[in-house]
């Protein structure tokens, strides 16, 4: 999703940082809601994903999803799917393309996704 007039300008990755891309319109809207509700925590999420989207240092906050949610398809390619806990309820889900060093945000919301409630 390319930025449009009036959109925030994302900083480009520098050095070893990963590129962050929004994969869905819903994720773009949810990211905006997270920024409005918890800007500091959302910023920390952004920095963590740029630095190391595969980090296992804080598994309560950032972890790979399991079972049927462990992978998802984007553009015909299957990618590992991870989740980052931004707030008590807010989550970001992302796919990792290691070859392109790109993180694709596929879900962002101030609410916990319902598909993990069962």
List the predicted regions and their residue ranges.
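Basic, Lys/Arg-enriched alpha-helical interface segments
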Residues: 1-90, 96-118
């Amino acid at each position: 999703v390319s930025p449009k007039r009036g959109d925030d300008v994302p900083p480009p990755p520098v050095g070893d940082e990963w590129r962050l891309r929004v994969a869905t319109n819903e994720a773009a809207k949810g990211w905006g809601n997270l920024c409005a509700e918890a800007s500091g925590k959302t910023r920390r999420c952004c920095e963590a994903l740029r630095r190391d989207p595969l980090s296992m240092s804080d598994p309560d906050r950032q972890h790979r999803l399991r079972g049927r949610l462990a992978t998802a398809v984007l553009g015909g390619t299957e990618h590992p799917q991870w989740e980052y806990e931004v707030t008590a309820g807010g989550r970001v889900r992302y796919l990792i393309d290691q070859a392109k060093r790109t993180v694709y945000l596929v879900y962002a919301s101030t609410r916990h996704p319902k598909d993990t409630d069962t």
